[in-house]
Structures are given as structure tokens and as C-alpha cells.
Regions:
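Conserved RecA-like ASCE P-loop NTPase motor core of nucleic-acid helicases/translocases
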Residues: 62-70, 91
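Short, surface-exposed connector motifs at secondary-structure boundaries
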Residues: 56-64, 84-87
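C-terminal catalytic or substrate-handling cores of phosphate/nucleotide-
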Residues: 69, 74, 80, 84-87
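Conserved beta-strand termini and adjacent loop/short-helix elements that scaffold enzyme active sites
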Residues: 41, 91-93, 117, 168
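Conserved motor-coupling elements within RecA-like helicase/translocase cores
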Residues: 82-86, 90-115
């Protein structure tokens, strides 16, 4: 049998299985949009600085995503921002599946200026109104600040002409350096393509829609609800575990358990 992996950030397992000569990059965007610009700032007074950056975006009716290391920090930061007269909401795994799309819709509509979370962009969120992704404590090595996670997270600011990333860090870790180099490489490729083809980057216009599922459908999984093949799920779980993506592996494990209960 043959398998085709499709990923913006393939893990080591996929790369190993594919072999370098069989990996095809698809980096060019027809819209001409570039990868975001990147800035590194010290962690001292990072929250104070973040507040000023959020206010700048708010004046232009733009949104911000802020990434912390823990759920507790996400909630605490969101509460503090609210006290500072910034419309903020936190979002992490404890938010029910059917609540998440509602919060994201409200962010896009402007009810919130900023969304605070842990790994918001690992699920491929498409939020064209977001112009700033702020990663707090970016130099704390670990899964949430790995090269792959940083690339995925920074890519969340690539849906807007003014996309920008701020990494709050006192040192440049290996993961940070590799992620920054990769984003810059992709940005350079797009700039050259735009120049050769006389393309002027265009903003993404995306309609804000209501979540299509009714509230009674409480058992929908946000990522795997259409997958019926148990063996495929088990393979995905193993790949996630090998790539140290334990949160993803746990989600798939729970889904397999639910499907088994449904067969009993």
C-alpha cells in the first residue's frame, strides 16, 4: 500500500517514511501573502509590552493571539488584560468543543481584541483578522516551544498583509533559531515569486459564518469526527506520540475509546 502525507509541518516520522527525494514543498500562495515578519523582545515587562501592542492593533480593528505555556497562565493573563480594559478571552482544551467555534467567531467579529491560549494554532485555525501572534516565554524549550510548534504558531499571522510575530525571549534557543530561519526562507521564496510574476499581495476575505452543528450534537470531535477507520486512528496516535505531540495522541486515544464503547 502507498500513503501520501499532507502537512504544513511534517514530523520526523513522516519525513523518515517518505524519504527526502519524495518530499514536495508547496510554499507559494496565489494571494501573494508573505510569511509574517518576526521580532524578538526581552521577557522583562513582556505583559506590559503586549498590552501596548494589542492596543495598536485594536485601533486598526485587528486582532491578536497570545500564547502562554500553561492553562493557568492563559486564564490569568486573559483576566489581567480584561482588568486593563482590553477585551480578552482565553481558549484551551477545557473549553467544550461546541464553545470553541463560537469564541473564534466572536474574535473575528471584534467582540474580543485578543485570544489567549497555549497552542491555539496547532489546529490550523484560519483567522484573517489576526495581525499579531505574541509568544510569551518563547525561549522555554519544550514541546510547546519546539521548532514545529513555533512554525505552526507563527504561521497564524500569515493570513493578513500586516502579519507580525513577537517572540518574548532572553535567549535564542535552537528551536527558535530553526523556526525563524524556516519562516524567513519561506518569506524570501514568496517575495521572489511575487517579484517575478508582478504579484501584489492581497488580503484574505473570509465570510464569518455560524457554527453549522446544532448544540445537541455534543459528541463531535473537532478534528477526527469524519474518520471511521480505527486502524488509521491508531496509526495517527502512534505517529503523534513518536513526534512527542502527546496532547494530540491523547485526543485520538479518547476518540478510539469512545468508538469502541459505541460498538459494545
Amino acid at each position: 500500500s502507498k500513503v501520501v502525507y499532507v502537512s504544513a509541518t511534517p514530523g520526523e516520522e513522516e519525513k523518515k517514511e517518505s524519504g527526502q527525494k519524495y518530499i514536495i514543498e508547496q510554499l507559494i500562495r496565489p494571494t501573494g501573502l508573505l510569511e509574517p515578519s518576526i521580532e524578538i523582545k526581552p521577557t522583562k515587562n513582556q505583559v506590559k509590552d503586549l498590552i501596548e501592542e494589542i492596543k495598536k492593533r485594536r485601533e486598526k480593528k485587528q486582532r491578536t493571539l497570545a500564547l502562554t505555556l500553561t492553562k493557568r497562565l492563559a486564564e490569568a493573563l486573559s483576566d489581567y488584560l480584561t482588568e486593563e480594559k482590553i477585551n480578552s478571552q482565553w481558549l484551551h482544551a477545557e473549553i467544550k468543543t461546541l464553545e470553541r467555534p463560537k469564541i473564534l467567531k466572536e474574535l473575528r467579529e471584534g467582540k474580543y481584541d485578543v485570544l489567549v491560549g497555549i497552542n491555539l494554532l496547532r489546529e490550523g485555525l484560519d483567522l484573517p483578522e489576526v495581525t499579531l501572534v505574541a509568544i510569551l516565554d518563547a525561549d522555554k524549550e519544550g514541546f510547546l516551544r519546539s521548532e514545529t510548534t513555533l512554525i505552526q504558531t507563527m504561521g497564524g499571522a500569515a493570513r493578513h498583509l500586516e502579519g507580525h510575530v513577537i517572540l518574548y525571549a532572553d535567549q535564542i534557543t535552537g528551536s527558535m533559531r530553526k523556526a525563524i530561519e524556516e519562516i524567513k526562507r519561506r518569506r524570501k521564496i514568496q517575495i521572489e515569486y511575487n517579484r517575478k510574476n508582478k504579484i501584489k499581495p492581497k488580503a484574505i476575505i473570509k465570510e464569518i459564518r455560524d457554527w453549522p452543528f446544532a448544540p445537541k450534537e455534543k459528541e463531535i470531535s473537532s478534528e477526527f469526527w469524519i474518520i471511521q477507520d480505527k486502524k488509521l486512528l491508531e496509526k495517527e496516535m502512534k505517529i503523534a506520540a513518536r513526534n512527542l505531540d502527546f496532547e494530540r495522541a491523547a485526543k485520538i486515544r479518547d476518540l478510539i475509546k469512545k468508538s469502541n464503547e459505541g460498538l459494545d
